[in-house]
């Protein structure tokens, strides 16, 4: 999701918490009068990750559009939401938690809503299908290789999670085995057996998470097969994806989202751009072709390493990356009297903070392009910016997560 940096706590597909209220704004809710959908998920009542299960896709879009219009009414006109032609199997990053029941049955899938009880899921209607097949086969292989699942309560066991990432344009597949120990019994034979079932796998990585924590990924990666990363293409550029780095999960909508963001920047080839919360550098690298200079700022170390590599991979020479907190970095820029023509900000769902927003005001860029994945925090941040000299020109919502309540939005603000 745009702006989510570093590690994460739970399955981002099925167990994300609902938006927190900001400035008294209503959160997005499912309408009681709704058209039924033919796409029925057998796990809906147990999993609870898809807020709009059983709702016709057109009705989902209508509800989200109405919500965004109401939320952003004080600021600007809201353009029609950009939906998907095919709203199924869109997630190209799939995470499964592993556990064992009291009867000894191995389960793999999503956390039951607001718990850490694992719901055993064979396939998910919003997840890339080959990724689900890989997870299913890993689950079936555990007993023959005598690999025990990790028990959060006791701290015993080995396999905690499996993360599968697949490049939409390249087809490259990365499998990340999250273990409580760096030692995987018969690791070579395990990888060989897995690749025999799925020869399309590009790389297999062992991630070590040996702490009593709800965080999914640990800090250490051991490559068991391949290069330890995959690549994908977006808007004509090639990007490296490592186990812990941020990369949008819906590539079809992401391309449209980023193209809109760069279009709203109105670049002529001379502008100095600040790409805040830049992740692996995707937006900044794509924009650099039409800009004078781009400065990318990101807190996640893995992501910033990938960003530097991505710039070199695409022969982009007018971009620099800094491993720093975006808010702190912008404050220091403002204190030094530095200027920027455009700020592109892509914060996490919690939105930005006042220190960052005040630094934007001090830098006084002519245009601010806000890429939001949290509507209510977006409204909160727009309220601050409009009080300090900016006018919101327009907002365009994108449905990057069909069957969930989440909405991404590109907003243009001008001095």
Feature-to-residue mapping (PLM):
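Nucleotide donor/acceptor-binding cores
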Residues: 92, 171-173, 270-271
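Accessory substrate-recognition/RNA-binding modules or partner subunits associated with SAM-dependent
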Residues: 120-122, 126, 131, 135, ...
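Short, acidic/hydrophobic/Gly-rich beta-strand patch recurrent on exposed beta strands
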Residues: 109-112, 176-178, 307
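Rossmann-like S-adenosyl-L-methionine
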Residues: 2-31, 186-188, 192-415
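Extended interfacial segments that mediate partner engagement and assembly in macromolecular machines
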Residues: 35-39, 49-149, 169, 184
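Short, solvent-exposed loop/turn elements at beta->coil junctions and helix N-caps
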Residues: 80-87, 152-153, 161, 165, ...
């Amino acid at each position: 999701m745009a702006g989510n940096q570093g590690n994460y706590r739970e399955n981002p597909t099925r167990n994300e918490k609902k938006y927190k209220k900001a400035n008294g704004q209503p959160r997005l809710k499912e309408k009681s009068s709704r058209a039924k959908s033919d796409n029925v998920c057998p796990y809906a009542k147990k999993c609870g990750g898809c807020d709009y299960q059983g709702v016709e896709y057109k009705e989902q879009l209508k509800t989200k559009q109405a919500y965004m219009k109401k939320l952003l009414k004080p600021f600007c006109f809201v353009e029609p939401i950009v939906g998907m032609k095919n709203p199924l199997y869109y997630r190209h990053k799939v995470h499964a938690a592993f556990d064992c029941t009291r009867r000894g049955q191995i389960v793999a899938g999503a956390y039951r809503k607001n718990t850490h009880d694992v719901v055993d899921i064979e396939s998910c209607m919003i997840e890339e299908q080959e990724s689900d097949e890989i997870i299913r086969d890993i689950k079936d292989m555990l007993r023959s290789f005598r690999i025990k699942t990790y028990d959060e309560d006791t701290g015993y066991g080995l396999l905690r999670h499996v993360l599968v990432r697949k490049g939409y344009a390249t087809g490259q597949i990365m499998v990340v085995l999250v273990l409580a120990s760096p030692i995987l019994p018969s690791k070579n034979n395990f990888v060989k057996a897995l690749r025999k079932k799925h020869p399309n796998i590009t790389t297999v990585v062992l991630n070590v998470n040996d702490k009593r924590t709800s965080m999914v990924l640990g800090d250490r990666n051991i490559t068991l097969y391949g290069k330890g990363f995959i690549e994908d293409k977006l808007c004509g550029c090639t990007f490296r994806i490592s186990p812990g780095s941020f990369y949008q999960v819906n590539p079809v909508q992401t391309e449209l989202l980023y193209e809109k963001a760069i279009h709203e920047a109105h670049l002529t080839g001379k502008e100095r751009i600040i790409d805040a919360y830049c992740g692996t550098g995707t937006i900044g690298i794509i924009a650099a072709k039409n800009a004078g200079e781009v400065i990318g700022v990101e807190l996640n170390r893995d992501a910033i390493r990938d960003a530097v590599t991505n710039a070199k991979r695409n022969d982009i020479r007018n971009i620099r990356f800094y491993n720093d907190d975006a808010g702190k970095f912008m404050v220091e820029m403002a204190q030094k009297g530095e200027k920027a023509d455009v700020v592109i900000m892509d914060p996490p769902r919690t939105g930005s903070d006042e220190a960052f927003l005040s630094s934007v005001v001090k830098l006084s860029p002519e245009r601010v392009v806000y890429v939001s994945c949290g509507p209510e925090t977006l409204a909160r941040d727009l309220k601050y910016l409009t009080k300090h000299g900016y006018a919101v020109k327009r907002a365009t919502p994108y449905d990057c997560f069909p069957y969930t309540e989440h909405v991404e939005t590109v907003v243009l603000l001008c001095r």
